[in-house]
Amino acid sequence: MSPQRMKLSSPPVTNNEPTATASAVKSCGGGGKETSSSTTRHPVYHGVRKRRWGKWVSEIREPRKKSRIWLGSFPVPEMAAKAYDVAAFCLKGRKAQLNFPEEIEDLPRPSTCTPRDIQVAAAKAANAVKIIKMGDDDVAGIDDGDDFWEGIELPELMMSGGGWSPEPFVAGDDATWLVDGDLYQYQFMACL
């Protein structure tokens, strides 16, 4: 493949998606050296970085101090970004660079600007973000309130009694399902 063709295959950048530029990463990284944290930093959200094992973490440096306030470890970057916004607004006020400036009035406020109160308010903000499960370990962004599984029904399985047994849960190798608030055991049938 020619270098020109490789350049064209990169994803397009749209005007409504903020992206990190080389100068922004350089100014945050301190000097021109690339550190391990600059390669794990989220390209859009301030104060958010990704751990090697996939969790997103957030922390903020206290103004005029070398110490940092740990805000937490989260499954999605949006949760970490909300936690950062609460802390940044408390510590820096209206001058803070926020990830979601239009939502700052709706976020919880710490009672004081002590690290402990900031951590509590940041945790509340992060936990208010709804996430959608995409697979076993994958999560995707913010939930818009629609539940994917709401519209899926298996009437043949439920009506014919094909393995569905409303017995109380007994610990074992069988999978468990929560149906209408009650815990039922689903016994797998050999289909082969």
From Swiss-Prot:
Pfam families attached here? AP2
Name listed for the protein in its UniProt record: Ethylene-responsive transcription factor ERF023
InterPro entries noted in UniProt: AP2/ERF_dom, AP2/ERF_dom_sf, AP2/ERF_TF_ERF_subfamily, DNA-bd_dom_sf
Gene field: ERF023
PANTHER family according to UniProt: ETHYLENE-RESPONSIVE TRANSCRIPTION FACTOR ERF023, ETHYLENE-RESPONSIVE TRANSCRIPTION FACTOR ERF042-RELATED
Carries keyword Electron transport? no
Q: Name one GO molecular function term.
A: DNA-binding transcription factor activity
| Entry keyword set | Activator, DNA-binding, Ethylene signaling pathway, Nucleus, Transcription, Transcription regulation
The main location class comes to nucleus
Cell compartments where the protein resides:
Nucleus
Q: Which GO terms describe its cellular component?
A: nucleus
Instruction: Set out the biological process GO terms recorded for this chain's protein.
Output: ethylene-activated signaling pathway
Chain residue ranges for the region called Disordered: 1-43
Q: What does the UniProt function comment say about this protein? A: Probably acts as a transcriptional activator. Binds to the GCC-box pathogenesis-related promoter element. May be involved in the regulation of gene expression by stress factors and by components of stress signal transduction pathways.
